[in-house]
Amino acid sequence: MKTLLLTGGSSGIGLTTVQLFAQKGWRVFELSRSGKTTAAITHIDCDVTDDTSMKHAVDQVMHLTDHLDVVISNAGFGISGPIEFTSVEEAKKQFDVNFFGAFRLAQSVLPIMRQQGYGRIIFTSSVAADLSIPYQSFYSASKSAINALALALANEVRSFGIRVSVLMPGDVATGFTDAREKNIEGANIYKGLHSAVETMEKDERSGMTTAFIARTFYRIATAKYPKPIYVGGMIYKVFCLLNRLLPKRLVNWIVG
């Protein structure tokens, strides 16, 4: 039986993804702070911002299985607000969950995959990694850092039979929107702050379904020759293509 380990599977994209893999007959391990064990999914408590918690969670998984086929780093959240009024602590928290959480997971599972001689690691990134969104700068930066990490890692571990990919979804309708930590300090100076965040949240609430993204994860997990980067959603593939073809000055003006 193939195995999946996924972080951040208690809700949203992660929950739909572990449910899909379980339906496909995989043994599924879901790591988060608030998930629940079901007949098909084994939940293990894990805080991706804590080294000890991550190592202990992966150790628990390996007490229950002798191999890992696919690992998906999906835990994440978002903050919004002007760069000028974002504290270093807020920025560090964003990176600690989104980037360093992914890094901790990769470090924890790589020795296992290296020893078994195969495995696949998939990182959840975002179209925001390619298109830096105003008032969502640190979220964009954390996802861009994940892309850079994944591309480098793919070359480092290819000889061990390990494949690494990134999935960059566009807007997806989940509880992620309501969970965003919004900093409205400076709204009297940055007049476009409220309207920019409102537009962003409206787009997210009317975005793609979690089922679509879960199916994309499954396609990446089972692909014979997985690509390094996938973009979720046709319109977002067009956006990312135009970002590469058009002058950066024009793209940045359009995004802004």
Q: Which residues does each PLM region occupy?
A:
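N-terminal Rossmann NAD(P)H-binding glycine-rich loop of SDR-like oxidoreductase domains
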Residues: 10, 18
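Substrate-binding pocket helix/loop in short-chain dehydrogenase/reductase
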Residues: 82-83, 90-92
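Active-site helix of classical SDR
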Residues: 106, 142-145
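A short, exposed helix-loop element centered on a Lys and neighboring polar residues
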Residues: 106-107, 151
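Residue(s) in the substrate-gating loop at a strand-loop-helix junction
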Residues: 126
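The beta1-alpha1 cofactor-binding region of Rossmann-like NAD(H)/NADP(H)-dependent oxidoreductases
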Residues: 46-56, 88
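SDR active-site lid
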Residues: 159-227
